[in-house]
Amino acid sequence: MNPTETKAIPVSQQMEGPHLPNKKKHKKQAVKTEPEKKSQSTKLSVVHEKKSQEGKPKEHTEPKSLPKQASDTGSNDAHNKKAVSRSAEQQPSEKSTEPKTKPQDMISAGGESVAGITAISGKPGDKKKEKKSLTPAVPVESKPDKPSGKSGMDAALDDLIDTLGGPEETEEENTTYTGPEVSDPMSSTYIEELGKREVTIPPKYRELLAKKEGITGPPADSSKPIGPDDAIDALSSDFTCGSPTAAGKKTEKEESTEVLKAQSAGTVRSAAPPQEKKRKVEKDTMSDQALEALSASLGTRQAEPELDLRSIKEVDEAKAKEEKLEKCGEDDETIPSEYRLKPATDKDGKPLLPEPEEKPKPRSESELIDELSEDFDRSECKEKPSKPTEKTEESKAAAPAPVSEAVCRTSMCSIQSAPPEPATLKGTVPDDAVEALADSLGKKEADPEDGKPVMDKVKEKAKEEDREKLGEKEETIPPDYRLEEVKDKDGKPLLPKESKEQLPPMSEDFLLDALSEDFSGPQNASSLKFEDAKLAAAISEVVSQTPASTTQAGAPPRDTSQSDKDLDDALDKLSDSLGQRQPDPDENKPMEDKVKEKAKAEHRDKLGERDDTIPPEYRHLLDDNGQDKPVKPPTKKSEDSKKPADDQDPIDALSGDLDSCPSTTETSQNTAKDKCKKAASSSKAPKNGGKAKDSAKTTEETSKPKDD
């Protein structure tokens, strides 16, 4: 295609690109109506020639129309390929029919020829060239596609399109594709496998198969029935064997053809050779006379009688349905009256209860031995039960009673578990040996559980019993372990009598010796006046009476150079400050009473809450309104501090180590009892927390005897 030819095409015809989809429909109409529209084409061609010069400068002014046309051509590419191919076929016919009248027609025809040339010259692989050439060439034919009735409308549209500019021509449109031809060699063809069917077997392979099987040509259809000889050969093939001869070649061929008909080609190839060898062996051994004799023994084949369809009866569906028949005896109703169990009735017609079974009597040892010895001696019969019973009575007197009880169970177990000896299997066990063995056994004691039926045993085991533990309640405590309380006439429990002997009043030396054990080393036994038992009791009483002085004296003694005699003197003076021990009223009460008293919530008056509870020693302080205060302890303290260290009181020397109990040195001997008890109550209060009421009670009790 030359660039001059593309320029000669009017711009208005090039801009008719959007009408490309309608080109295929009106292609044939353009050929038929072309002679009728010669006048219109001549007029339009003149108009296009005049405005072709105006369209060229407009091509550069409006470049935006190019992408619009390119998008339309790209979307309609598939339609253009088919249309161009058809237009190329119709082009020679159009050229022959069109008369060569005017140069204006030649221009339009030249545009059509250019489109045809581009379509023909383009090769199948030139896809780019087709896209470029279709855009200017195809719109030429869109002009005469319109029918004759719409000629005025087409002219108006053409005039309107002429005002628009054409697409810019680029160098790519002028370039031609010079590369190799593009072809699509891929094609899907179905190739059948060789030998899958008989038709696909090559002729050379058929000749090889025919030679191998001994078949020269295609098998002929043998519709003849098999004779008696052939049937005999077929039946007797499994019974005979021998060397092959040339007598039975015809039967081989006929039988092989039958096999070929029934089987496929693959099975014929593998199965035919062994059949030939086998049948050659069979036919040689049998002679014709033997075959004739064998065939004569067989009768003639009788034709099967044809079935008479009239004799066949149709089965009704209703009768053919399955019916469920009850078996005899499956239900109680189906049991015949003769076989039914009739319960035994009494005179009144009530059924009689079955008699209770007699309890089996305890078997003797001899009976058990007889039962056990049956396996060893099968020929021996059972003896009468009377004979062994007499012997068991004799065995009672002979065997001692204690031995019989111990031997009874152990001997039976040994008999049951002992393995059979091989010597006993040969002969029978003599009766004397069995009797001697029975005499050595004691009498079996009757088990009380043997008489019970099995059901009762199972029920007893299956029951779940809730048993109270021993001692869980007071009722379950055995009487030997119960605590018996001694009560008086009123029913109140009596206090146990004091078993301890009342100790004589303790001297100061004894108390000092008991208290000074922790401070000094071991003393001689001659210094003590009482025995060791009384000393231990006295020490425990002193400790319980004065807890403040004893419990808090945990500090180690000073390592001084004083002698033991000085310590004894100091302890003697310290013991003088202690009062005499008073009996505790709560000491003899039982433990149960103490627990009950503690559990009860009682209101007790606090010390000093009322005037009655104030101790008499402190009442004068309230009467004097706090003016008179005890000045004696500080005066003593000041006097003692003025004394030299050598003349110091031994009580102060000992009490210096007791940091937690300084009240003993400050108080006088007259008020020593009250203050020591107060110090004990004050020391117990922070430890026990909520036990201040009990301490107040003790102070009240100590104050009352003083008032008396």
UniProtKB/Swiss-Prot annotation:
Start and stop residues of the Inhibitory domain repeats: 170-222, 304-356, 446-499, 583-636
Pfam families recorded: Calpain_inhib
Ranges of biased composition (kind: Basic and acidic residues): 46-65, 249-258, 275-286, 303-328, 339-366, 375-396, 441-501, 561-575, 583-646, 691-708
Positions of modified residues (N6-acetyllysine): 50
Positions of region (Disordered): 1-187, 212-404, 416-527, 543-708
Chain positions with Phosphothreonine modification: 135
Name the UniProt record assigns to this protein: Calpastatin
Gene: CAST
